[in-house]
Amino acid sequence: QTRSAVVAAVANAADQAAGTGDKARVVVVTTGTEQDMDDAQFTSALDDATSKDVSLSVVHVGEGNVDAALKSAADSFTTVDSTDETQLSGAINKAAGI
């Protein structure tokens, strides 16, 4: 259900950005994707939901399968080892713009 959650989060961020005039960032931390929509549906839904003021950053943790469509859609995508707490923390902070 990662894909539908990402679409909802991006749509919410786009609404927030439009309402405030500020840019918004969506950070997704995932261990893999349970596909609830195919690649074409996901890409189309994400294109409909997003705006120029929203960025999507994804941190993929561990050895699970990387969602190629999510990776392609992300403005930034990082894969980290789940056993390296420092690397994980750094990747999340970077994705969040901290």
Predicted regions: what they are:
Residues 32-83, 90-95:
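VWA/integrin I-like adhesion module and closely mimicked acidic/polar interface patches used
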Residues 11-14, 72-75, 98:
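Short secondary-structure transition/capping segments
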Residues 1-25, 36-37, 59-66, 86-91:
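Von Willebrand factor
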